[in-house]
Amino acid sequence: MKFVLAVHGTRGDVEPCAAVGVELRRRGHAVHMAVPPNLIEFVESAGLTGVAYGPDSDEQINTVAAFVRNLTRAQNPLNLARAVKELFVEGWAEMGTTLTTLADGADLVMTGQTYHGVAANVAEYYDIPAAALHHFPMQVNGQIAIPSIPTPATLVRATMKVSWRLYAYVSKDADRAQRRELGLPPAPAPAVRRLAERGAPEIQAYDPVFFPGLAAEWSDRRPFVGPLTMELHSEPNEELESWIAAGTPPIYFGFGSTPVQTPVQTLAMISDVCAQLGERALIYSPAANSTRIRHADHVKRVGLVNYSTILPKCRAVVHHGGAGTTAAGLRAGMPTLILWDVADQPIWAGAVQRLKVGSAKRFTNITRGSLLKELRSILAPECAARAREISTRMTRPTAAVTAAADLLEATARQTPGSTPSSSPGR
């Protein structure tokens, strides 16, 4: 069968879809990925075929971060509305053209968490099954929590409903234009509802342990498979292994694709606080910054690392709150501090706090004093014990990928508008 996996976002958004793609290819299927241009090399390094899909996601995440920072400033409401619309529909027309070409002859089209309408329209045009893969709870529910904000279930549901209506409003013109280009009639409902009515499963690529009650609230059409990762095996780093073995387990710090506005000052703060605690720090540092920043001996800077081999050798993890890093840290049984900023990061921060496996604070509000306080809290024995207990309740990587691939195969065999007769178990 031919599977087309269309996903836009950062590496953390693309990797779960690529992990399923690798498994489908292993099973003998033809797999084609549509990803941001800056991540084509990433998916091709896994042996998958990639084509450019939408704008550069590194540039886009910088734009989103700047947009969020500017929300508190007084500005023209019309300019604000225009900026929101541009963020959500940038590249829609070109993405539609790309996906229409790529999906010719496909048995299934899968979308990631954004630009659902692009994939929904293409699947409808070819009358083929569709699916979605979500790595945090996107649909309306009453189970998520945001740090420092009261979040009763009724308020959570109401807020999410408003958010979806806003998204439908800002994307309707782009959606209409794509449908006209494809010769489709005006859409009777928003894209997410159209996907649901066509029987598209919404695969939840995270563990329900993070959101107690969510699996019961949702139907079988939103099956949980667990966090998806490609389990990439980087080249052995003897220098890093030697540094880790030479002292006490370090605290890992990494902020993924989230832009750090003051990397030099941030590194100095981490170094000073860890020195005060008598801890060592292992810090992910992008190559562009690595050679320009000096640091003390108790600090080690690294590039991309294999989480499955390195994190279990650490004492705790501090990160931006991406879904993949959150899952990797807790799979390793690590107490966690999330310094969140944008997108789904506050949702994971809230989950970590609610599970009592760590703490959370907005990145822009962190100071030496508050970082010291938060690290002391997650290094407490009871927090570490709770993190180890939660790790035993998480789905293993191979089981998660297998379940997701099984679901996509079953969906591809269905007539659009029906649902798979059964879902694979966890």
Swiss-Prot record:
Gene Ontology MF terms in the entry: hexosyltransferase activity; UDP-glycosyltransferase activity
Top-rank taxon: Bacteria
UniProt cross-references to InterPro entries, sorted A to Z: EryCIII-like_C, Glycosyltransferase_28, GlycoTrans_28_N, UDP_glucos_trans
One of the protein's GO biological processes: lipid glycosylation
PANTHER family per UniProt: STEROL 3-BETA-GLUCOSYLTRANSFERASE, STEROL 3-BETA-GLUCOSYLTRANSFERASE UGT80A2
Family: To M.leprae L518_C2_147 and M.tuberculosis Rv1524.
Protein name stated in the entry: Uncharacterized protein MT1577
Originating organism: Mycobacterium tuberculosis (strain CDC 1551 / Oshkosh)
